[in-house]
Each structure stands twice: as structure tokens, then as C-alpha cells.
Amino acid sequence: MKIALIDGEHYPDVVKWALDKLGNVCCAVFLGGSEKIGSLEEVERRLGVPIYRHDDYLTALARALAENPGVKEVVDLSDEPIVGYEDRFRIASLCLLHGVTYRGADFVFKPRPLNRTSKPSIGVIGTGKRVGKTAVSGFVARTLKAITRPVIVTMGRGGPEEPELIDGEKLEITPEFLLRIAESGRHAASDHFEDALTSRVTTIGCRRCGGGMAGFPFFDAVDRGISLAESLPHDLIILEGSGATFPPYRADAYVVVVGARQELSSIANYFGPFRLSLADLVVVTMADLVKEEKIEKIVGVVEGVIPRAEVHVTVFRPRPLGDVSGKRIGLVMTSEEALESSARHLEALGAEVLHSSGNLSRRKALLRDLEGFSGIEGIAVELKAAAVDVVTRWALERGIEVIYLDNEPVNIDGKNLREAVLRLGKKVLGRRADDTRR
């Protein structure tokens, strides 16, 4: 079955002609306009199908989709000036959320079928790259260890061809171990290594290539990773996205990570609303790097798209995975803007930060920076990008201690993210337990 999107800028006879050509149209949604029609009752009689209408056309479309569960496709028979680019992205977001294809005269947005895991699951996805998604995913895993035994399934652009299990609960992940991984030709700073290192949980690394506008991967090996996760004695699967792309599984709940430095348009428009609409919990990160007005706008956008979601505004604080007290260190991160506050935080822990670089994702510039790192006995570095094959190798060759850094999300809005994650975890575990009993 199909739903047709119509407007008052077309004569009813023309719309009827188009509906007949489409065939199998169960209803129509009126988007606006009145130039070429009389009353909607007249139009409805002429077309011979029910017409849904609301001041907010998305509300009308959502109702039409809810009341006609057999619909497979929404067909757009409207045009400028009734709908523009932004309107059509909003419509596409709603259609994809319902698993329905959205088709127009020269475009098609088709959802990828999303399977469900046999075990309870929480998705951690981002609205873009470099928003701190892996840090939040690690935080979620560490937090949930208090009530369950989680396993993280990642998918990265540098992930392994076959799913790779890292037993972070038992394996000692040292700089030397990671360097051996890198020297074997594998990506030792891949997300599943980072999660295992920072959260001491079991992780499974998968790969993906390409990402669509809405966030579906072009190719991925996640199915085999999920099968492996479901064979383990763990109770809950955390599905971790990659950049703005997410695993092709429908999780029981979602944590959506929004970076405060992102362009507001990428959150509010295009397929930002689609990602947000999945959220049960929204974590706004790096709030200390923008003005308060920007944060207010981001929160406003989130609440406008998904009012039921709980929103947390956070900053990242470096959490060294080794002792930095009394040591002269260098600091290496991916973000130039975060260097100053991170250095202050490490100095509050007793370190003396002599040098710093925000070029972790720019290898040539990073090597130039490292040449000037004199007089240090340790180097603190995020496990990202060139952390292993460049920074770790450079440090170990010189007998310098490597201290990996985690980025811990800390609320600045008076809320408690840890408690929110625990509530979400209990809700997901409880819901699946109820389903099993039924």
C-alpha cells in the first residue's frame, strides 16, 4: 500500500489522475496550499481516498502511518512552494523511522531492514564524527557493569574483516601489546581496542565501509559480530556506531551523542532529526567549547524533535589510565581546543604538563610536534588515530612511559548521567524479561 502526499496547488482532477497511475493508494496526506481547490471534503470525495490533515503536516503523516500499518511507501506528489528541501528531509526522516520508503519524482529514500538482537541491546550512535561517541559508549559500558555484564560490538572504517573479540575483562592491554597489533598491520586504535582498554569489558570489532545520508552503512560485517556476541555468556549488547553511521540493528533503546561544536544545521536539518528521533537519552558533549547560547539552541532542537528523550549537557574530563602524579608529561589529543582544559585537569592530578599537541589525527604535524617534546618522562595520549603507530612507538623507542587517556563525560547541567544510564539499562533489561515471560 501507498500513502500519497498532496497539496492545494494541484487541481483535484490532476491529483486523481496521478493516484490512478500510482495504484494501491490507501490514503493521502494534505501538506498545504489552497490556490486550486475548494474544501478538503470536496477533494476527498473527488479522490476517493481518506485525507489526513493537521496544522503540522508531520503529525498528519505520523497518524496516517500509524493507522495504516501495511503501508510500504510514501509517494510525494507535492512540489514547491508547498514543500522545500528542508520539508522533504523531515518527511524522509519520519518515513525512515517507520521503516517506509519515501519516493518523489527524482529521489528515493529507502530504509535498510533492521534486525533485532536476541539479547537486550542499547545503541550508542552519533550525529557526526568527533562528537565523543566512543567515550560515551565506554562510559555506558562501565556504568552498566554495576547491574549487568555488557559486551560492546563496534564497527569501524579500520575494523577487522572477521569479527575480533577482545576480552577486556581479563586481557592486559599494554602499550607494547597495542604496538605489536599495529606492527602486524591491524588498526590498534580501533574502537573495540579503546573500549576494552578504557572500560575493561569484552568487545567485538567489526568493519564497515561507506555511510549513507541517513546513517546506514554500505558494506559491513556486523551480522557476524552480533552472532558472536549472542553466543557469549554476556547479558546485554551495546551497539556502537561509527561516525554518523550506525549498526544495521534496531536496538531496544538508544543513546544519541551530539557534539556541541557541530553546525546546528546538521543537527536540526537533513537527517539529524532521524538520528535524534531514535533517542531515549541524548548526550550533548564538549559544551565547554561553545557559548551557552549554542547549547540552548541545541537543546531546543533536540526537545523539538524528540520531547520524550532525556537530555544531558556534558563536558569531557581526561581520565588517565595510569598514574600521572609527580610526572613531567606531554599531552597529545585530537582536539586543539580541548588541550588547555585537559592540561589543567591533569595538573590538578599532580602532573606537570610540559608540552602538548592537538594533532593526533594529523600525522605529519604530530611528528613535528613530538620532535619538540623534550624533558618528559611520560606522554598522555588518547587512544585515537595515530596514538599507537606514531605516539606509542615514538615513546617506547625513547624509554618514555605511555599513559592512555579516556575522556569521561561529566554533567554541567545539574543532572546525573550515570543514574540516567542505569535507569535506561534497567528499563531495557526489564522489558526483555517481560517479553520472555509472555
UniProtKB/Swiss-Prot annotation:
Protein's GO biological process: gluconeogenesis
UniProt entry tagged with the keyword Nucleotide-binding: yes
Gene Ontology molecular function, alphabetical: ATP binding; cyclic 2,3-diphosphoglycerate synthetase activity; ligase activity
Principal location: cytoplasm
GO cellular component: cytoplasm
Keywords, ordered alphabetically: ATP-binding, Cytoplasm, Ligase, Nucleotide-binding
Catalyzed reactions per annotation: (2R)-2,3-bisphosphoglycerate + ATP + H(+) = cyclic (2R)-2,3-bisphosphoglycerate + ADP + phosphate
EC number(s) per entry: 6.5.1.9
Compartments reported by the entry: Cytoplasm
Stored HAMAP family: Cyc_PG_syn
Family indicated by similarity: Belongs to the cyclic 2,3-diphosphoglycerate synthetase family.
Function: Catalyzes the formation of cyclic 2,3-diphosphoglycerate (cDPG) by formation of an intramolecular phosphoanhydride bond at the expense of ATP.
Protein name: Cyclic 2,3-diphosphoglycerate synthetase
Classification lineage: Archaea, Methanobacteriati, Methanobacteriota, Thermococci, Thermococcales
Encoding gene (name): cpgS
